[in-house]
A protein has these predicted regions:
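Nucleotide and nucleotide-moiety/phosphate-recognizing core
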Residues: 1-126, 131-153, 169-176
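Conserved anion/nucleotide-ligand pocket segment
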Residues: 156-159
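Catalytic donor/gating beta->alpha subdomain of glycosyltransferases that bind UDP-sugars
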Residues: 164-165
């Protein structure tokens, strides 16, 4: 899906490529993303949701941890990712932003050690990502620190409704004008 003339997945990869040595896209239709220099994996559970995507992505990583972002976030910022990485610690399973709107589980750092607990939740039909947090070591990062990297927290904006897609186009035009 394009925003500002560029597919969201391409926007995300452009930001993440200089930061990470391993990029994984969870999709059941890899042909839709031909030409991308990424590793593809697919869901191992039949239910399609963020939690199954998280599980598949963590299962595919070679590293101990992964930065995870939803593929509907067109405005992620390098500075925001780096800010979150600075707060991550080897002794935590999840490093997640916390804002007035709540937690941002689809813009977070996850350890491979989360896999079993995520799988248990999926097998129980529990699909909300943040529900696993009570069974994990979680580090929350307050928005006052994150706003230093992304004052408007635009990195958390996602486009999962037609109205939000329209709003994203407006934001993209504004950002292009300011650049």
């Amino acid at each position: 899906m394009p925003v500002g003339g560029m597919r969201i997945i391409d926007r995300i990869i452009t930001v993440m490529r200089p930061i990470f040595d391993e990029l994984i896209v969870v999709t059941n239709i890899p042909s839709a993303y031909q030409g991308l220099d990424v590793t593809f994996t697919n869901d191992t559970f039949t239910t399609r949701c963020s939690m199954t995507g998280l599980h598949a992505g963590l299962k595919a990583i070679k590293n101990k941890k992964a930065f995870v972002v939803g593929c509907d976030a067109p405005f992620i910022k390098t500075e925001m990712i780096k800010a979150l990485l600075r707060f991550d610690h080897p002794d935590v399973d999840v490093t997640v932003p916390s804002t007035q709107a709540g937690l941002e589980p689809l813009f977070a750092i996850y350890s491979r050690s989360c896999l079993n607990i995520i799988a248990q939740h999926l097998l129980q039909g529990r699909y909300k990502v943040s529900d696993v947090y009570s069974r994990l070591r979680v580090k929350t990062v307050d928005e006052r620190y994150l706003r230093k990297a992304d004052p408007d927290l635009i990195s958390f904006f996602n486009v999962n409704t037609p109205d939000l897609i329209s709003k994203a186009e407006t934001i993209s035009l504004r950002m292009d004008t300011q650049a």
